[in-house]
């Protein structure tokens, strides 16, 4: 059975409810982070979706040197711990350097490896050594079958709890495209798959000093992923995306999230009751 046990009360994979990894791209203020986590959690509870709060304490791969990056690791982890304690949900956040793995694992239930860094062996091994669930985003430059090598590295490091995320493939300059064959291909490695609906509509560097995006297409891609078969969805969400300091053009407005998720859930339920064609 393809399933990853993230916490005592959360499993992702076969026989489990759809899971949503969601939150603002980067930690902004402490109050705003808690507000967003609470708002998304209420929607997920209403719809019967498992929820993991996502936000990055540091966006180390911003397009411009002048772009907002977030907070020092210690401050970001303190805020994420408040989300866990006060909202009562697991959290996922990125690590960019090997030395971050152990301290981040003390708070985060899932360590996320950014797409640009998915082949960095030392980073993968450090994450594997923590024993936490690891969500690896497939690089925009990788074929889905090449993620088998990433999985092999993690397994060699002792990782047993792995998630693999599709987030689009480079399609010329400043553009991404999704090859949905990647979902069953990566799932064949024996681990649950996640579809990142909002980064898949990103236009990397498309605004010169920042990335653009086409958030209006994210719901369509998410429905397609649900139709093919996916264990979790990744969606960045913001109260006011047009004012967000990072990835605003991609993010789903909070007030639209419930309406975005409802048809995705219907498709997911149908596919869960439909045999997969050989």
UniProtKB/Swiss-Prot annotation:
<dbReference type="InterPro" id="IPR013785">
    <property type="entry name" value="Aldolase_TIM"/>
</dbReference>
<dbReference type="InterPro" id="IPR006269">
    <property type="entry name" value="KDO8P_synthase"/>
</dbReference>
<comment type="similarity">
    <text>Belongs to the KdsA family.</text>
</comment>
<keyword id="KW-0963">Cytoplasm</keyword>
<dbReference type="GO" id="GO:0019294">
    <property type="term" value="P:keto-3-deoxy-D-manno-octulosonic acid biosynthetic process"/>
</dbReference>
<dbReference type="GO" id="GO:0008676">
    <property type="term" value="F:3-deoxy-8-phosphooctulonate synthase activity"/>
</dbReference>
<keyword id="KW-0448">Lipopolysaccharide biosynthesis</keyword>
<comment type="pathway">
    <text>Bacterial outer membrane biogenesis; lipopolysaccharide biosynthesis.</text>
</comment>
<protein>
    <recommendedName>
        <fullName>2-dehydro-3-deoxyphosphooctonate aldolase</fullName>
        <ecNumber>2.5.1.55</ecNumber>
    </recommendedName>
</protein>
<keyword id="KW-0808">Transferase</keyword>
<comment type="pathway">
    <text>Carbohydrate biosynthesis; 3-deoxy-D-manno-octulosonate biosynthesis; 3-deoxy-D-manno-octulosonate from D-ribulose 5-phosphate: step 2/3.</text>
</comment>
<dbReference type="GO" id="GO:0005737">
    <property type="term" value="C:cytoplasm"/>
</dbReference>
<dbReference type="Pfam" id="PF00793">
    <property type="entry name" value="DAHP_synth_1"/>
</dbReference>
<dbReference type="InterPro" id="IPR006218">
    <property type="entry name" value="DAHP1/KDSA"/>
</dbReference>
């Amino acid at each position: 059975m393809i399933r990853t046990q993230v916490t005592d009360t959360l499993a992702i994979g076969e026989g489990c409810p759809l899971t949503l990894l969601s939150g603002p791209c980067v930690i902004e203020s402490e109050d705003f982070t808690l507000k967003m986590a609470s708002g998304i959690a209420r929607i997920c509870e209403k719809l019967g979706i498992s929820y993991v709060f996502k936000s990055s304490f540091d966006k180390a791969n911003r397009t411009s040197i002048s772009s907002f990056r977030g907070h020092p690791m210690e401050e970001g982890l303190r805020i994420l711990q408040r989300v866990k304690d006060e909202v009562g949900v697991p959290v996922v956040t990125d690590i960019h350097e090997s030395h971050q793995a152990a301290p981040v694992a003390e708070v985060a239930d899932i360590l996320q490896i950014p797409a640009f860094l998915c082949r960095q062996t030392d980073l993968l091994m450090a994450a594997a050594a923590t024993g936490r669930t690891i969500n690896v985003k497939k690089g925009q430059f990788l074929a889905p079958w090449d993620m088998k090598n990433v999985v092999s590295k993690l397994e060699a490091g002792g990782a047993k709890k792995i998630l693999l995320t599709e987030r689009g493939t480079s399609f010329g300059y400043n553009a991404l495209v999704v090859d949905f064959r990647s979902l069953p291909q990566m799932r064949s490695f024996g681990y649950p798959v996640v579809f990142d609906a909002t980064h898949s509509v990103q236009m990397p560097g498309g605004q010169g000093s920042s990335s653009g995006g086409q958030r209006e297409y994210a719901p369509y891609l998410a429905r397609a992923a649900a139709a093919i078969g996916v264990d979790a969805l990744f969606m960045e969400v913001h109260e006011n995306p047009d004012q967000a300091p990072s990835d605003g053009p991609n993010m789903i407005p909070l007030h639209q999230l419930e309406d975005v998720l409802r048809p995705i859930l219907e498709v997911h339920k149908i596919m869960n009751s439909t045999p997969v064609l050989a």
